[in-house]
Amino acid sequence: MNELKPLVIGDLVVKKPVIQGGMGVGISLHKLAGAVAQAGGVGIISSAQIGFREPDFTTNFVEANLRAIRREMKSAREISPDGAIGFNIMVATKHYDMWVKEAVKAGADIIISGAGLPVSLPEHVEAAYAEMKEDGCPPAGFSWPPLYLPPSPPW
């Protein structure tokens, strides 16, 4: 049987050319994404209502979702420290820019965007990097997301 070729996107090389779809609200979270990444594919966490389990979700929707983005990414990394893990973030959401920036800061390897054209994605990724630079340094394990590779890191 022929072996499948690895998936190569920029500097990201994924052993198995499988991208797990981002299935929202509560389906594509850290356990599924981490397991897919551990198995050699690309694990995707859905940002759709990601903070629904937070106690203040109904009263503090934005902060609850931002915390959940960080927590889900950290938990997925614990399952697959070296695997390819990213987020599915719908362009049509009111807080698209905030979700993208938080996913980048959390260490996402890739961001997949649908439900609209992600024309502002590079701008939001660049803004997140600028904020990270202002804070002093990138997070542990930082690498440029493969779909937006500037010529050199800003630090």
Model-based region annotation:
Residues 1-155:
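Active-site entrance/lid segments in N-terminal catalytic domains of soluble metabolic enzymes
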